């Protein structure tokens, strides 16, 4: 008996490494000293006076179930990168490098490569290097054809350029940056609504969406790195990545207890997919705002005097952005 008999194919793992090396190479920056293949990725830090390293880790959650149902694996890697880098940039940091963890019961290189291609694409959009990762073959641990992902991102910022959320005060404006769709949160509820309660198939064409349900649900999470870079000349007082917990749980993370975010519903158009979920699932409005991004993937808080310039810069790079509310004196966290 050997390791392969027990369900772990080392040769398949080595084959995968050879396949992904050239893919990862397309993401490398001048600061990468050693990337995929070594025991560790090496990254050199230059030209910083008082640097602070910022780290984040995340996954894609049960959105992966949609990828399995569709047998489409080339976009979930973008989701993985987005979930990590969007958390890093809210501090004022620039993403430097990324690592991934891919775990499956029986390794299929062709599937794994599609995932890695998505990760590399996400890294290129975010301007960070894919310098390493781990592929784990765990026989008997996952259902056939299924896998799980985790991502790890490190960014950097000068200490004096860290976003100071303590400066947020009454009257500050809340700018919302449009999401690309559901992003990567709330999929357990999404699957319950569409597939269990209403017996939809991922192949069903949804006229309101103009596409098959599966394609709509797999739309990649938006990466906001370039959008936030466009605002670097302005004083950003705070940012919130609208992920699990939606508006209700994420925006208060950057607010003092004496102030709240008053959101003006109707100041942006809620994407059709959320209206469908709410109607088909008979979900209360506040629950929607606590589960989903509702069309706003990133919130940026600025002084009212900077609003016009911020919108001009964002619109100038093709970013859809809206003034969606203001900061008020209250202990309510988020007021809808």
UniProtKB/Swiss-Prot annotation:
Main location per the UniProt record? cytoplasm
- Tell me which UniProt keywords the record has, alphabetically: ATP-binding, Cytoplasm, Ligase, Nucleotide-binding, Purine biosynthesis
Q: Which domain of life is it from?
A: Bacteria
Q: Name one GO biological process term.
A: 'de novo' IMP biosynthetic process
CDD domains referenced in this protein's UniProt entry, alphabetically: PurM
Instruction: Output the Gene Ontology cellular-component terms.
Output: cytosol
Instruction: Give the location in the cell.
Output: Cytoplasm
Identify the EC number(s). Answer: 6.3.3.1
What is its pathway?
Purine metabolism; IMP biosynthesis via de novo pathway; 5-amino-1-(5-phospho-D-ribosyl)imidazole from N(2)-formyl-N(1)-(5-phospho-D-ribosyl)glycinamide: step 2/2
Q: Which transformation does this protein catalyse, written as a reaction?
A: 2-formamido-N(1)-(5-O-phospho-beta-D-ribosyl)acetamidine + ATP = 5-amino-1-(5-phospho-beta-D-ribosyl)imidazole + ADP + phosphate + H(+)
An annotated Gene Ontology molecular function: ATP binding
Which InterPro entries does the record associate with it? PurM-like_C_dom (IPR010918), PurM-like_C_sf (IPR036676), PurM-like_N (IPR016188), PurM-like_N_sf (IPR036921), PurM_cligase (IPR004733)
Q: Which family does it belong to?
A: Belongs to the AIR synthase family.
Q: Which NCBIfam families match?
A: purM
Annotated protein name in UniProt: Phosphoribosylformylglycinamidine cyclo-ligase
Q: Which organism was this protein described from?
A: Thermoanaerobacter sp. (strain X514)
Q: Which gene encodes it?
A: purM
